[in-house]
């Protein structure tokens, strides 16, 4: 005689106590029963009898607080959450009273869900889903959504989903409770057919007529078994628990990010307005980063370009001891110092300067206040400043203290409005007529915002005699022949002047050091702008987290459905994190586009803008990481939901 196989389900003194109120509620009280492979069992009882709680424990949706539950000889209490998810996915198929279909998924997509978590390839899933729907008379409605189906049709879809992974046990909780009598009879006929195929069917109901369709009836009252109609001869099976016959080994969502992305897209499309609001915060944050960095980089390059336009091989000598800001009245530099510097090796051009600011120049009733600068003919070469019209004064003019002048563009336009070329015209400086012999090309502003074109250049000797008086210099500019030797040239000038003066009463700076200093300052300002913009991205990330937390609350039942069909906590974590990352990724791309557009618009108003690939890439990566970080907390909350609690959510 063959050995009797062990029961598929064995309960010994099973208890379930809920401590949610002041008085503990004992939903199940020392329930003991066995169910063998292939049985059709109806568990009947009135509301509050504990039948639904028993079904949740049988289907591994809930855990007992006492007693023993063996499934195929295995103590279920010894299984970890991943193993329990495997049982829900492969061993049990759930048919719920309220159908529990995902509203945003079609009939076929609802049916294939357990196979998604089983790691089956998409074409196999769809093929089996359509085959099951055809078998249940729903083939023509495989693309319909739940709200387009009747109650009976939705329950058929639910049964097809339960069969997707070819489970050993069908758990049907009040499957006819929400159906009309005709649809109810059809559903019961389907359950009977599944039993005939050899599956174990456990039917939960409060209706005696429905229970009569089963081969065995177990009645519960106040959490206890009060009736058991008997036990048919066991059938037995050598099918292992936890994997559908012929199915793929469980790969999990972690190995199928594409599936998680598809689910995320479906969920996000289900509430376009909320998704758009979530996107908006990220878009604005990324756009702010891209725009501000483009403006900051543009401003930096504008300033650096202005310094470079002066030349990176210039040495600027000013009177006054180092560490003390020049006052403009220091008299430590003289023309003879300039002559001595010009004799040093490696000097391409040397130009002493005697400035007088706020001088009024006049022409035919037009008064204009400007700066008059007395200098040498080498000034144009030292400053690398070409002529627009006319010529620069020469050594003869310098020797004769000639009343001749070269105008900057700003002075020329204000003193000679409407005249393209004022060369040959006269204007007055302190009632002394000066002849315009040339006009410089436009130079623009200095790095510090001073208009370089607002200047009148005259011979140094003329400035001493007719404008400023005295014989001292405001500054001295020296251009070296080779920029690589600028440090050596600076040291030579410092040694020369210290030897001539007997002390260090001057300051020497080179434009290269100035360039480096300004570049550091501008980099700091650019980073500051970027940091301010990143704050808006941070705010957008907090918005993503808030919306995702709301989404988890609203979709608690969906999470319960996914857990009931075999999703692991890691699958739920991946899905909701993927949704957050998808939102931030799309928002990041849109933000980069908006930021580039905004920067171009700003450039139309004259602000300097410079695009580099770095800021958009960094901004997008920050948006992506924002989704990852701020989406984790809501995703973790979703992943930690209890299946039975999630399923009971409204």
From Swiss-Prot:
It is a multi-pass membrane protein. GO terms for molecular function: ATP binding; ATP hydrolysis activity; transmembrane transporter activity. It holds the Pfam family MacB_PCD. The keyword Transmembrane helix applies. It is an enzyme of class 7 (translocase). The chain crosses the membrane at residues 276-296, 525-545, 580-600, 615-635. Residues 9-248 form the ABC transporter domain. Its EC number is 7.6.2.-. ATP binds at residues 45-52. GO terms for biological process: response to antibiotic. It comes from the Bacteria. GO terms for cellular component: plasma membrane. PROSITE patterns: ABC_TRANSPORTER_1 (PS00211), ABC_TRANSPORTER_2 (PS50893), MACB (PS51267). Keywords: Antibiotic resistance, ATP-binding, Cell inner membrane, Cell membrane, Membrane, Nucleotide-binding, Translocase, Transmembrane, Transmembrane helix, Transport. It is found in: Cell inner membrane. Belongs to the ABC transporter superfamily. Macrolide exporter (TC 3.A.1.122) family. Non-canonical ABC transporter that contains transmembrane domains (TMD), which form a pore in the inner membrane, and an ATP-binding domain (NBD), which is responsible for energy generation. Confers resistance against macrolides. Homodimer. This is Macrolide export ATP-binding/permease protein MacB. It comes from Rhodospirillum rubrum (strain ATCC 11170 / ATH 1.1.1 / DSM 467 / LMG 4362 / NCIMB 8255 / S1).
């Amino acid at each position: 005689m063959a050995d009797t196989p062990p029961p598929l389900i064995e309960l010994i003194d099973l208890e379930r106590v809920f401590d949610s109120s002041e008085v503990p509620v004992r939903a199940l009280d020392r329930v003991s029963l066995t169910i063998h492979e292939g049985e059709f069992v109806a568990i009947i009882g009135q509301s509050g009898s504990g039948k639904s709680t028993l079904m949740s424990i049988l289907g591994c949706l809930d855990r007992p607080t006492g007693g023993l539950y063996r499934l195929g000889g295995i103590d279920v209490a010894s299984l970890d959450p991943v193993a329990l998810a495997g049982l829900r996915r492969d061993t049990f198929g759930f048919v719920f009273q309220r159908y529990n279909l995902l509203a945003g998924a079609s009939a076929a997509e609802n049916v294939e869900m357990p196979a998604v978590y089983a790691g089956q390839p998409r074409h196999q899933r769809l093929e089996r889903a359509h085959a099951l729907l055809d078998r249940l008379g729903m083939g023509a409605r495989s693309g319909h959504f739940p709200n387009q189906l009747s109650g009976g049709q939705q329950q058929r879809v639910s049964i097809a989903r339960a069969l997707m992974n070819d489970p050993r046990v069908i758990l049907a909780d009040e499957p006819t409770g929400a159906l009309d009598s005709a649809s109810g009879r059809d559903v019961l006929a389907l359950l009977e057919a599944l039993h005939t195929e050899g599956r174990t069917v456990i039917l939960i109901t409060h209706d005696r007529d429905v229970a009569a369709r089963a081969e065995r009836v177990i009645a519960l009252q106040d959490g206890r078994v009060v009736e058991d109609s008997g036990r048919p001869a066991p059938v037995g099976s050598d099918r292992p628990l936890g994997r559908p016959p012929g199915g793929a080994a469980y790969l999990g969502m972690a190995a199928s990010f594409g599936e998680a992305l598809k689910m995320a897209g479906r969920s996000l499309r289900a509430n376009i307005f909320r998704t758009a609001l979530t996107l908006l915060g990220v878009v604005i944050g990324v756009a702010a980063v891209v725009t501000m960095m483009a403006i900051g980089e543009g401003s930096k390059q504008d300033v650096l370009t202005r310094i470079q336009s002066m030349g990176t091989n210039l040495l600027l000598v000013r009177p006054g001891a180092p560490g003390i800001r020049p006052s403009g009245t220091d008299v430590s530099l003289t023309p003879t110092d300039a002559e001595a510097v010009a004799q040093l090796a490696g000097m391409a051009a040397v130009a002493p300067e005697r400035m007088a600011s706020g001088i009024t120049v006049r022409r035919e009733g037009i008064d204009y206040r400007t700066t008059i600068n007395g200098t040498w003919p080498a000034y144009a070469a030292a400053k690398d400043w070409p002529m627009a019209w006319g010529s620069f004064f020469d050594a003869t003019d310098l020797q004769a203290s000639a009343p001749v002048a070269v105008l900057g563009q700003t002075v020329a336009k204000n003193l000679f409005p409407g005249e393209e070329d004022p060369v040959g015209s006269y204007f007055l400086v302190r009632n002394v007529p000066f002849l315009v012999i040339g006009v410089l090309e436009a130079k623009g502003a200095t790095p510090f915002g001073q208009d370089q074109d607002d200047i009148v250049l005259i011979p140094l000797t003329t400035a001493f005699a007719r404008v400023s008086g005295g014989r001292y210099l405001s500054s001295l500019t020296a251009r070296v022949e080779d920029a690589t030797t600028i440090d050596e040239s600076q040291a030579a000038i410092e040694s020369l002047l210290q030897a001539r003066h007997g002390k260090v009463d001057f300051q020497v700076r080179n434009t290269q050091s100035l360039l480096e200093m300004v570049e550091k300052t501008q980099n700091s300002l650019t980073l500051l702008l970027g940091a301010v913009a990143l704050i808006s991205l941070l705010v957008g990330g907090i918005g993503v987290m808030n919306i995702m937390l709301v989404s988890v609350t609203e979709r608690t039942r969906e999470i319960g459905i996914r857990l009931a069909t075999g999703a692991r906590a890691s699958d739920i974590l991946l899905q909701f994190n993927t949704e957050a990352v998808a939102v931030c990724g799309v928002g990041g791309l849109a933000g980069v586009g908006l930021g580039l557009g905004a920067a171009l618009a700003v450039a139309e108003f004259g602000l300097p803008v410079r695009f580099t690939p770095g800021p958009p890439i960094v901004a997008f990566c920050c948006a992506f990481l924002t989704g990852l970080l701020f989406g984790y907390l809501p995703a973790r909350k979703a992943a930690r939901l209890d299946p039975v609690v999630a399923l009971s959510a409204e």
